[in-house]
Swiss-Prot record:
Chain residue ranges for the region called G4: 541-544
Cross-referenced NCBIfam families: IF-2 (TIGR00487), small_GTP (TIGR00231)
GO molecular function, one term: GTPase activity
Main location group: cytoplasm
PANTHER family, alphabetized: TR-TYPE G DOMAIN-CONTAINING PROTEIN (PTHR43381:SF5), TRANSLATION INITIATION FACTOR IF-2-RELATED (PTHR43381)
Name the UniProt record assigns to this protein: Translation initiation factor IF-2
Residues binding GTP, per UniProt: 441-448, 487-491, 541-544
Function description: One of the essential components for the initiation of protein synthesis. Protects formylmethionyl-tRNA from spontaneous hydrolysis and promotes its binding to the 30S ribosomal subunits. Also involved in the hydrolysis of GTP during the formation of the 70S ribosomal complex.
Encoding gene per record: infB
PROSITE patterns per UniProt: G_TR_2 (PS51722), IF2 (PS01176)
Originating organism: Streptococcus pneumoniae (strain 70585)
Residue ranges annotated for the tr-type G domain, each copy included: 432-599
Location(s), subcellular: Cytoplasm
Amino acid sequence: MSKKRLYEIAKELGKESKEVVARAKELGLDVKSHSSSVEEAVAAKIAASFKPAAAPKVEAKPAAPKVSAEKKAEKSEPAKPAVAKEEAKPAEPVAPKTEKVAAKPQSRNFKAEREARAKEQAERRKQNKGNNRDQQQNGNRQKNDGRNGGKQGQSNRDNRRFNDQAKKQQGQQKRRNERRQQEDKRSNQAAPRIDFKARAAALKAEQNAEYARSSEERFKQYQAAKEALAQANKRKEPEEIFEEAAKLAEQAQQVQAVVEVVPEKKEPAVDTRRKKQARPDKNRDDYDHEEDGPRKQQKNRSSQNQVRNQKNSNWNNNKKNKKGNNKNNRNQTPKPVTERKFHELPTEFEYTDGMTVAEIAKRIKREPAEIVKKLFMMGVMATQNQSLDGETIELLMVDYGIEAKQKVEVDNADIERFFVEDGYLNEDELVERPPVVTIMGHVDHGKTTLLDTLRNSRVATGEAGGITQHIGAYQIVENGKKITFLDTPGHAAFTSMRARGASVTDITILVVAADDGVMPQTIEAINHSKAANVPIIVAINKIDKPGANPERVIGELAEHGVMSTAWGGDSEFVEISAKFNQNIEELLETVLLVAEIQELKADPTVRAIGTVIEARLDKGKGAVATLLVQQGTLNVQDPIVVGNTFGRVRAMTNDLGRRVKVAGPSTPVSITGLNEAPMAGDHFAVYEDEKSARAAGEERAKRALMKQRQATQRVSLENLFDTLKAGELKSVNVIIKADVQGSVEALSASLQKIDVEGVKVTIVHSAVGAINESDVTLAEASNAFIVGFNVRPTPQARQQAEADDVEIRLHSIIYKVIEEMEEAMKGMLDPEFEEKVIGEAVIRETFKVSKVGTIGGFMVINGKVARDSKVRVIRDGVVIYDGELASLKHYKDDVKEVTNGREGGLMIDGYNDIKMDDVIEAYVMEEIKR
């Protein structure tokens, strides 16, 4: 038989454990505490002892009338609620009603219960206040004992503290038991629970019945039609059977459509969720909130244990649910593996060089491992992240049976494609454009004077030294038609500028002086024009001079491939005088005639492209570039890429210095708004938005930097000797600052071409703009001097140069810069000396003097012997000694030299083995000018 503990019996009876233990001892049971266990029979005996003897079973009485909560509260005492209930029981029953009333569960009066609990808590607080007062008095006694007593007082205090704690714990346990009893009573009086499963089953059955009723009629119609068809099939032909079957099928579809359109009526769903009931407040008094010490620690430990137990239970549940722990599912069949869908191969595959195996696999919907296997069979070892070249990709696609096509990628940063292809032009929008004419020729042959005459301005007077320093672009109007002129320098240093002018021009006017004829730069201009396939118009200038000979010029040009139309060639010759405005109109008419033959056209509707004629850095405006529009129309605020830089057209001025907003084809304009000054000769293109222009410009700058790094020379076995030899050369470091980019290029090229043996020119830095402080700092660090061409240093840069002793040389004529640089380079060389024999003498007699040495008497037979000259001793045609004279005398006098035919005496420094008939050769070392 099972056993029960006494505290379990007390809990069932709603009594305290002390009362149950005392009653068990009264019944003669050997129990020690509430944890003692007894048999079930003994437990029943103990429980029976608590039941009142005078409580016989009473027959069922009629239902007592409801008593109001206020009356119950008046009858009940706050200190002992249980006794109050017992006293309320013997109330006389009310006469039963004649009507039979169904028994209803009596509802709880929560308000009355809360008021009873409040009164009970108030009584308990009064008792606790008295206990606290007693405890305070005991504490004061303990303090007095502690002051007066010694060890005995300390032990008494400990005992009293222990007793107080024990009493406190007993009181807490008592209140806990009372709360449990009240909760048990409330749980016994709770309303019966709702069976949700039964309700759900009933609802489902009702829904099924409704569905059966709605579909019964359709089923009967279908069954009747089926039976009628079966009867008709017995006596009809097959053709009629098929026709009727088709009709019935149509009818069935119509019925089904009607059923689908008309929704079935559904009863509103019954809310079967359990309503949230009001839970009574826990019977806790304010004394529990004021507790601290062991009581509070015990509560914390119990809450921690609850959390720990919950975690352990969750861990155990998860462990049970893990794969393999469920023994009942071991023999179950595994779930079927879903088959992968088969994707058909594409018919075409567009690829780019450098595609990886993984990218190809994704495009053709195949596994990378399959492609790696195919490549291995083809003899190509590759991984899925490895890039493949175009040839390998094509072979792979052939193996799969796919047509491979290489994707043509348009490089957004490549603006050169606009100058090679013209597919972007609209043929319907092409219009005639002005011709671009370049004036070329030798220096001082009258190019700028001719252009000055054409423009009716005095440009030539502003040029230093009478030569043009950089390209100028101008536009004039002749007979209602515009002509754009480019003026190129004629000096030898500006070869690259003439080449750029020929590349953007349509017609070349070759100016040749009638008195000078063909010169080196004339031949160079002819070669540039022929290389650019540009027609040449020869303007024989200065025919007003007395020594002019145009026929000689025509003959010299014919020797270089420029034939006159009069001689059967294709070049027009016009004799002019730019100074006196002679035959200028004829020259312009010839230009328009040649332009008409060429049929020059452009599309002004597309975005503008063109070439940089010149670029410079302005102190107030920043980077300024002179552009020649070749196709399209350039507008203000257009996003533009120029060479390796980009920007937006902030302002635009024409050749007259006036602001314009639009520039059509063959129009030269100066723009501002670029990030940096571009290089002369760079191409430009307008983009659709600033974002794409910025991306293209940054990409072009990045490529230019990479190209520059790749061009860096490396030391190899072939050039090792040249590198070592170059290290022995002396170097002249130069920083070049000029007004325009063309002058910078010309200066750099000219200085590097200076050929002085043993010295080389190193261009440390070259840029456009004024000389600033950073240039001076760089010159000081690199031991260089600064050459300023048509620019001046800032005041701060000048002060810093004086303080740091940096040399700044300012020039406005290029050939003077070259001459000055040659002198500086020659001055850096070590002096070079040449040996020069000044005389010969023969030893006639020797004299040995003690403590002095050997003195040789000689006679000069050729030239002279000087005191500061060097001498060689030659014996039998062999040089015995080479040294210097220690003394030279004529008789007894010291002399500076002994001339031809005279006699004298000499003594050689450090040499005494002089003999008769020795030849003394006197010579000096003279410096050679380079």
